[in-house]
Regions:
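Pocket-lining segment of extracytoplasmic ligand-binding domains
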Residues: 106-187
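Hydrophobic/proline-rich hinge and linker segments of small-molecule sensing/allosteric domains
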Residues: 6-13, 89-113, 209-213
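Glycine-rich, phosphate-binding/catalytic loops in enzymes
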Residues: 26-28, 92-93, 193
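A mature extracytoplasmic/lumenal domain signature
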Residues: 11-15, 57-59, 95, 107, ...
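A ligand-binding cleft/hinge motif common to bilobed small-molecule-binding domains
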Residues: 61-62, 68, 73-88, 134-143, ...
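Extracellular/periplasmic catalytic domains that process cell-envelope and extracellular macromolecules
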Residues: 1-3, 67-70, 94-98, 117, ...
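Extracytoplasmic small-molecule ligand-binding "clamshell" domains
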Residues: 1-87, 154-158, 222
Length: 228
């Protein structure tokens, strides 16, 4: 990558992470990788032959395959670290820790006081996410004790957490799951969201960028940058 003077960053278009404003890239992940580009060129003393970060927008479900197939070199998105994913990719130093997966409901929610109250309720999530897996396990546990399962609805796999939060806010779907950091941020923008910070599907999670297992040097550079 340094030899080709290009690092290809896989990004998911969203309202905050990566988007274009009047033809110019913007967003949290754009700004982070723009800083990383400067960090790499300073550290490696590239001089006039600078290494550039190129952004490749993909759909959420394409992130892993695009990385493994060599379309991009780094997943520039907060991916939830899981043992299964660690078998396939190299994760960086976490960009977020103590991550919780929480329930978010809309403007006319049915009362939800704890996880048990999800029995018989509709929840919409992207089926490719760890949220879906966790909801499936919880729903199965309800059925084993004779309670109604969660009415688990598969959202379109193109939809991001932000998309689903907007749909919940508009009353189009009753509830979804996202991480606590994202829920807190968007509740300040979307006034009809009801957060349930104490209803936690999973906790103590970590968010990280990811590289291929054959890119330890890139992962090392990312780790050093994240720690600065």
């Amino acid at each position: 990558m340094v030899k080709t003077h290009e690092i290809r960053a896989l990004v998911v278009p969203s309202h905050s992470g990566f988007f274009y404003d009047k033809g110019q890239p913007r967003g949290i992940y754009y700004e982070a990788l723009d800083e990383f580009q400067r960090f790499v060129n300073t550290k490696l003393k590239t001089g006039n032959l600078k290494t550039n970060v190129t952004f490749i927008p993909v759909r959420p479900e394409q992130l892993e395959s695009a990385l493994l197939e060599g379309v991009g070199d780094v997943v520039a998105y907060g991916v939830i670290v899981t043992p299964e994913r660690e078998k396939k990719v190299l994760f960086t130093t976490p960009i977020g820790s103590d991550v919780k997966q929480v329930i978010v409901s809309g403007p006319t929610p049915r009362p939800i006081a704890n996880l048990d109250d999800l029995s018989g309720k509709e929840v919409y999530v992207n089926p490719l996410t760890v949220y879906y897996e966790n909801l499936q396990r919880l729903s199965e546990s309800f059925q084993k004790t004779g309670r109604p399962p969660i009415l688990l609805r598969k959202a379109d796999t193109n939809l991001t957490d932000e998309d689903l939060l907007e749909m919940v806010n508009a009353g189009l779907v009753p509830a979804t799951v996202t991480i606590n950091i994202r829920a807190q941020f968007w509740s300040k923008v979307l006034p009809h969201l009801t957060l349930h910070p104490n209803i936690v599907l999973a906790e103590d999670g970590q968010l990280a960028f990811a590289t291929r297992k054959d890119s330890p040097q890139l992962r090392k550079l990312l780790d050093e940058f994240i720690k600065t």
